[in-house]
């Protein structure tokens, strides 16, 4: 009897323990479910995973050799296909700091043309390894510096001769002889010409961001400054002889000079701005300004007006140095005009055959 009660008591105890364990498990499950639901709600709505696009980037290895000795200077690696020659020059400058980018000339072949900075590596590469030849271009200066030096020099040099500073002319002769009115007019026209050049260089022309060698700067300055000194010396000399036909010759040539200067300015304004279509490659077209109607006759009216200015200045002053300078400038500008005219013919052949390069119906 005692054993039976003992067994019943033990069974009763097991039943209570199992019920308590079940309740504790249920409580734990409820807590876990509540925590899981709160976590899902805080995570927000499920987003569909987008497919990851794997773009294969091609890298090039640029081997740079000396153009004279063919010795390897450096290797520029990890160059992408969209990188330009200018980017290669920048990396080359980091490897060789003594050569800054504007001084570096890169060629595909020895003696070949220098690669332009805007060319991409993909356009010149035949394989993943590209060999380029390096040439030191020497000391470089910007084109803006070249133009400012070319035009500032003649402006100041002419004024020095016009003021008849000492040690240029005989002081006694200079004080005795008065300047002819054409001398003052010539100084005015000469100053207007080069002041216009300077202002257009700073505010009108879209000067290239490229560079040129210091030798080219010295050559250009020697040409312009030297001829200006020669011209100014003769025109401002105390023994200067006025034009043969007097004031009528001076007045007509001066008016024509000012007309050509105005026309040159308006043409440069048209050339510096894109066309109404927004395409810089389009042939520049005339507008409502009568000075721009010269585009109907010639491809390069800016050279036409420039030569017209110097011919007028030659007639107005009637001096040999101005005539020689005008002749040389005419030859040079005719070569530039023919070259540009050929480019226009290739691009706009149906429209350009009826035009001349610089002089209407002649050249």
From Swiss-Prot:
Record-listed Phosphoserine modification sites: 37
Main location: membrane
Cited Pfam families: Steroid_dh, TECR_N
Annotated EC: 1.3.1.-
Membrane topology: Multi-pass membrane protein
Enzyme class per UniProt: oxidoreductase
GO biological process: very long-chain fatty acid biosynthetic process
GO molecular function, one term: oxidoreductase activity, acting on the CH-CH group of donors
TM region positions: 143-163, 216-235, 250-270, 311-331
Cysteine-cysteine disulfides: none
Subcellular location: Membrane; Endoplasmic reticulum
Source organism, top-level taxon: Eukaryota
UniProt keyword terms in alphabetical order: Endoplasmic reticulum, Membrane, Oxidoreductase, Phosphoprotein, Transmembrane, Transmembrane helix
Xref: CDD domains: Ubl_TECRL
Cellular component terms per the entry's GO annotation: endoplasmic reticulum; membrane
Family that this chain belongs to: Belongs to the steroid 5-alpha reductase family.
Descriptive protein name: Trans-2,3-enoyl-CoA reductase-like
UniProt source species: Bos taurus (Bovine)
Lineage of the organism: Eukaryota, Metazoa, Chordata, Craniata, Vertebrata
Gene name of the record: TECRL
């Amino acid at each position: 009897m005692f054993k039976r009660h003992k067994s019943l008591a033990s069974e009763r105890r097991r039943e209570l323990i199992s019920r308590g364990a079940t309740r504790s498990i249920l409580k734990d499950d409820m807590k876990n479910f509540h925590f899981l639901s709160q976590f899902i709600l805080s995570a927000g709505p499920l987003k569909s995973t987008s497919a990851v696009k794997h773009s294969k980037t091609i890298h090039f290895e640029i081997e740079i050799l000396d153009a004279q000795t063919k010795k390897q200077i450096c290797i520029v690696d990890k160059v992408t296909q969209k990188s330009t020659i200018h980017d290669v020059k920048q990396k080359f400058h980091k490897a060789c700091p003594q050569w800054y980018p504007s001084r570096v000339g890169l060629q595909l072949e020895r003696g070949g043309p220098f690669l332009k900075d805007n060319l991409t590596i993909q356009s010149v590469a035949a394989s993943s390894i590209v060999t380029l030849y390096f040439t030191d271009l020497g000391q470089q200066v910007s084109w803006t510096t070249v133009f400012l030096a070319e035009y500032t020099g003649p402006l100041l040099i002419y004024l020095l001769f016009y003021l008849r500073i000492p040690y240029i002319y005989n002081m006694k002769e200079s004080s005795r002889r008065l300047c002819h009115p054409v001398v003052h007019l010539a100084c005015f026209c000469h100053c207007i010409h080069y002041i216009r050049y300077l202002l257009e260089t700073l505010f009108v022309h879209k000067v290239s961001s490229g560079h040129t060698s210091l030798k080219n700067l010295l050559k250009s300055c020697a040409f312009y400054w030297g001829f200006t000194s020669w011209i100014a010396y003769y025109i401002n000399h105390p023994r200067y002889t006025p034009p043969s036909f007097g004031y009528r010759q001076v007045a007509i040539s001066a008016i024509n000079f000012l007309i050509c200067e105005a026309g040159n300015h308006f043409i440069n304004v048209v050339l510096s701005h894109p066309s109404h279509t927004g395409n810089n490659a389009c042939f520049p077209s005339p507008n409502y300004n009568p000075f721009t109607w010269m585009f109907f006759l010639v491809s390069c009216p800016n050279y036409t007006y420039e030569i017209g200015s110097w011919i007028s200045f030659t007639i107005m002053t009637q001096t040999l140095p101005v005539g020689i300078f005008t002749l040389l400038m005419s030859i040079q500008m005719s070569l530039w005009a023919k070259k540009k005219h050929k480019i226009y013919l290739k691009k706009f052949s149906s429209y350009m055959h009826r035009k001349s390069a610089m002089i209407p119906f002649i050249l």
